[in-house]
Amino acid sequence: MSALAGILVERGFAVSGSDPKPSAVLSRLADRGVRVFQEQSSATIHSLLGHGSQPPLVVLSSAVRDTNEEVAEARRQGLGLCHRSDVLAALINHQPSIAVAGSHGKTTTSTLIATLLEATGQDPTAVIGGIVPAFGSNGRQGSGRLLVAEADESDGSLVKFSPTLALLTNIELDHTDHYPDLQTLIDTLKRFSDGSGALLANRDCPILREHFQADAWWSIQDPDQADYAALALQERGDGTTAAYYERGEQIGTLEVPLPGRHNLSNVTAALAACRREGVPFADLRRAIGNLKAPGRRFDCRGLWHQRIVVDDYAHHPSEVAATLAMARLMVESGRSPLPSQPQRLLAVFQPHRYSRTAQFLSEFAEALALADTVIVAPLYSAGEAPIEGISSEALAAAVKAIAPSVPVRAAANLDQLTDQVAACSEPGDLVLAMGAGDVNSLWDRLSIHGDPERPAAALAL
């Protein structure tokens, strides 16, 4: 929502919005000319009536319920209401655009595409689900021809989008509150891809290979079967050296500053999208060295009593496993971009939603067993009703059953979580907090618990 607000105000629209929680994002929007209300009430709607030549259009996300005071008052006043996806569709469908969808990696991939296009002089407009380090925000209005957008599949609304190029990163069952089974998710993404001008897809994903006919494929496994490919030559904790191929022919090498095979795939996808837009490979190769992942993607918050504290948005088993594998590579290779070299891996994981935790309890346990120590934060319900037998304690027990030698604890609340991290961690530990809920407050809570040695808010992978 904030990315759309910023772009619309730069396009000359009068934009207002409400959020009861002050934040840096709201401050930045206010600085850009967005009128920000810090309460949500019927009075907000009344204050907007009578201003301008047309009545206001009220835009809401899937997280906003019909019982919301502003929504209810807007209906009483006969105002138009639309979903955020309708506004995003209006942007995507009316200019050349690249829309990135998929179960994992879409925020990072769309960030990388926008960053590469900007670095090579294309000046794109971007609407991303995370903070793009090169822009300092999650959205920007560019003067170039292209728009880059993250297309979120969680509520199915991406079927409204008709981009010039649709990009699919991978498919796994998720968002089980909306999709009863994998086939329903596949069908939704097929509707999205069928409505696009062309499809660029990940050949390494077996579900994509089986169910989709892409106009072009990328791979980090088989350059002979993909239009664009990168094969790792050396994997390190601070990045990857890779050979880059187009249509089976090696055309150069890459120094990717983002570690992990999942990031190599994300970078290859971004390169493929930019190459399809005609950006010279030499320009892209120069720009790759400055790539950074979006906010909350292995985001190093700083050093706390010689512990390295990192925040990550991983909340699906595959994401947790990929993030822990990358962290393990940093520990074992002796190389990392972190402020000091990590010696041990302490995973702090917050389950997100009862439905997701119930669906993937054993998969989460297997992924978390990759850590040296595990602390399970209190489950973040995201408004869901509890499910009997599903809890942080149940997940901790599942980890213990798989890996009896791994110390595992479950925290009843965030205060106890902070105390447990302080008690269980050691100097040299990489404390990796993962989840889509409020576990990202761990750094601030630790800072209150004891002064940090060195904040590193600007340091991110």
Residue ranges and their predicted role:
Residues 1-87, 229-231, 251, 259, ...:
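N-terminal leader/targeting and accessory segments in enzymes
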Residues 7, 165, 236-238, 247-373:
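Nucleotide phosphate-binding/pyrophosphate-handling subdomain across enzymes
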Residues 7-10, 30, 44-50, 62-203, ...:
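Phosphate-binding loop of NTP-binding sites
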Residues 13-20, 199-203, 346-350, 370-381:
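Short internal beta-strands
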Residues 16-20, 37-42, 82-89, 127-130, ...:
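Beta-strand->loop->alpha-helix junctions that form or flank phosphate-binding loops
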Residues 32, 308, 365-427:
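C-terminal helical cap/extension that packs against the catalytic core
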Residues 50-57, 145, 426-429:
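Short acidic/histidine-rich motifs immediately flanking catalytic phosphotransfer sites
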Residues 376, 449-461:
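Short, flexible loop segments at boundaries between secondary-structure elements
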